[in-house]
Structures are given as C-alpha cells and as structure tokens.
C-alpha cells in the first residue's frame, strides 16, 4: 500500500511538473508571437489577401456563368488557403535560416522538374510539358522552382559580395541562373523561362554587377536575339510574334493561333467603362479565359474601372515589394525582395500585355488572379519570404528561434 502511494505521489509530481513546463512554454510562445506581430509587415499580406478575395469572387462568378466547374473553383479556394497559411509559416522563419538550408530545397525543386520527363506523370499540351499529374491534382513544378531559385540565387550572390565582378565567380553565377532556364526551355515552357531570366537579371543588378558587364550584355542582345529566333524558338513561337504585326496572318489564323488573343481583346473591350456585370447574356467566348486571359474577363464584367482597379492594386503591390527591398537589413534580404518583385512585375506586365495584344501569348498567369493552384500557393509563399525579411530585422524571437540564432 505504501508503494502504491509513493507511485501516486511521484506521478502527481511529474504531472504538475509537466503542467508547469507547459505553462512556461505557452507563455514563451505567446511572447514570441506577440513580438512577431509587433515587427511583422501587415500591409503586404493585406494587399495580397485582398486581391485573392477578389479572385475567389471572380472564380465563383465563372462557375455561375458556366465558364468553369465547381471542382475547379474549389481547388482554387483550397490553394488560396494553403498558400496564405504557407506564407504565414514562411514569414515566421528567419530568412537567414532559409538561406542556410538552400541545399535541401534545391534538390526537391530539381527532382520535381525532372519528373516532367516521365511520360506517365506529366501532362503535355502541344510541346509544353509543364504540369505533373499527381492523382487527382496537377502541379506546376516551375512555380515551386521560382521560389527556390530566388532563395538560392540570393544566397549565392550575397555570399560573393564584391567578388561578383570577378569573371570566374560571375560565370558560376551565370551557370546558376542558366541551368533552370535551360531545363524549363527543354520542357517547352518558354514563358516560365523568361520569368527566370528577368528575375536573374534584376537580382544580378541588385547584387552590384559592374556597369561594364551590363553594357556588354546589352550590346550582345542583338546577337542573342538572332540566335534565339533562328535556332531556339520553334515555328509556333515565331508565329505568335509575327501575328501581332501581320494583319493578313491574323485573318488566316483567326480560328487557330490568333483565336485566343483576338477573342480576349474583344472580350476586354466589350465591358466598356463599367462592364456587363456578372449576369449578362452577351459574354464573348474566349478560350481559357480563367487562366492567362482572366484580365479579359475582368474587363468584360467590370469594365475599364475594374481593370484599372486591378492595375492599381498590382502596382501598389510592386511598389510595396520595392519598399521592403530598400528597408531590408542586409544584402541577402534585399536580393530576396527584389527577386519576388521581379517575378510579380514581369508576370503582371507580360500578362496584361498579352491581353492587350501588344505582347505574344507565352502562357504567363496574372499574379493572384489567374486560375492555377500552384501559382496561387507559391505567390503567397513568396510573399511570406518577403515578410520574413522585414519582421526579422532585429533579433526577434520567432517560433523557430533558438539561443544559437
């Protein structure tokens, strides 16, 4: 009987000890979370979530109008929630910690890209094999690779510092940038390859690249253009460029290569100033309007006013990203912010340019608005990376903080 009482006392003591430790840990977590909320950039997430809510509204209206099915809309909503939560989690982690672990992210991104060469796993559209089929879901690896590319390239350039203008080091940085571009080009996704190129150029410039290399690069543009036009681009790529300036070709390709852009331009203008609303019977059919041509749908339903509101929102987002870059505490943080800015800016300008028929159709989605789960998720996660650079300026004790940090 005495032994039983002893065991009871020991268990009771251990239970109270556990409760005490639990209370201490909870207090510590709440304190750190309060510190996080104090330092975190609240404006950037609000902008992104506001645009996302607007997108969900658009997607639901497309379901009501029979443009997409309910399952597609549900996938987009789930992707938005996962992206927002993922972005929040990334923002909790110090961006310097993410930089140190680049060697774990890079192989994952590479494996996902290489899986596109497995015929049974990929979805091939024309010559573009940019999507993986994983059970009931599709995944676009290049969107994940953009996030990893920004982290790895920022880490590489920040570690070099002034050595970036040393030719051997610059050549290694060039290999770092050209490898994912080349891999994605082989897979037929020229649009994503151009996004990587723009990110690469902007981050190089931010990294302190010498003007002599910049001038040399600009002088080589005609030669690079000639080689790309004659030896890299395929016939359908060249046709998309030529069709913008050739009225006769536009008529010939009205039901083929020029169909989406032609119908998208008509849909965009049909809304005039205030749009046709969400219950009109006079919608203009545009192939895949929910994807790369969602800006046409906005113009058709909400008119010029709706389009300008979207342009202003994206412009404010880009300016906020640049502001965060200027306020980042070190070169690594600045490079990460500039990389995300370059991605959002290029996506926005090229996508709207495609709809306005001033840029060829190259399959680049409009940030936070085009239907596409992977793009939606990774956009929010990239924003979480930018937020991390602002809320970890000081030694903020975040959730993953240790005394060794």
Region roles according to the model:
Residues 157, 194, 199-213, 282-306, ...:
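Interfacial segments of multi-pass membrane proteins
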Residues 305-348:
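Hydrophobic transmembrane alpha-helices and their immediate junctions
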């Amino acid at each position: 009987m005495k032994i039983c009482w002893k065991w009871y006392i020991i268990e009771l003591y251990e239970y109270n000890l556990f409760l005490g430790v639990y209370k201490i840990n909870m207090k510590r977590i709440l304190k750190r979370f309060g510190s996080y909320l104090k330092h975190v950039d609240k404006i950037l997430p609000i902008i992104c979530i506001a645009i996302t809510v607007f997108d969900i509204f658009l997607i639901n209206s497309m379901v009501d109008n029979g443009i997409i099915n309910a399952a597609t809309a549900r996938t987009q909503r789930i992707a938005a929630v996962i992206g927002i939560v993922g972005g929040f989690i990334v923002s909790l982690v110090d961006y310097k910690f993410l930089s140190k672990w680049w060697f774990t992210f890079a192989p994952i991104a590479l494996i996902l890209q290489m899986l596109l060469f497995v015929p049974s796993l990929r979805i091939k559209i024309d010559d573009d094999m940019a999507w993986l089929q994983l059970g009931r879901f599709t995944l676009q690896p290049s969107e994940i690779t953009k996030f990893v590319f920004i982290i790895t390239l920022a880490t590489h350039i920040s570690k070099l510092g002034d050595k970036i203008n040393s030719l051997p080091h610059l050549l290694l940085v060039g290999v770092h940038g050209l490898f994912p571009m080349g891999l994605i080009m082989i897979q037929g996704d020229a649009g994503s390859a151009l996004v990587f190129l723009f990110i690469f150029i902007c981050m190089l410039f931010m990294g302190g690249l010498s003007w002599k290399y910049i001038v040399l690069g600009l002088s080589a543009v005609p030669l690079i253009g000639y080689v790309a036009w004659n030896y890299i681009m395929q016939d359908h790529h060249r046709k998309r460029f030529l069709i913008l300036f050739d009225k006769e070709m536009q008529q010939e390709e009205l039901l083929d290569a020029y169909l989406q852009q032609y119908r998208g331009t008509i849909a965009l203008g049909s809304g005039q100033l205030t749009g046709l609303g969400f219950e009109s019977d006079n919608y203009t059919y545009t192939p895949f309007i929910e994807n790369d041509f969602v800006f046409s749908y906005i113009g058709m339903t909400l008119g010029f006013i709706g389009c300008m509101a979207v342009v202003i929102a994206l412009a404010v987002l880009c300016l906020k990203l640049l502001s965060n870059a200027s306020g980042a505490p070190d070169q690594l943080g600045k490079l990460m912010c500039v990389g995300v800015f370059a991605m959002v800016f290029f996506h926005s300008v090229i996508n709207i340019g495609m709809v306005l028929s001033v840029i060829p159709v190259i399959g680049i989605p409009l940030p936070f608005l085009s239907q596409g789960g992977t793009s939606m998720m990774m956009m929010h996660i990239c924003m979480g990376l930018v937020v991390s650079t602002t809320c970890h300026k000081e030694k903020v004790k975040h959730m993953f903080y240790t005394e060794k940090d």
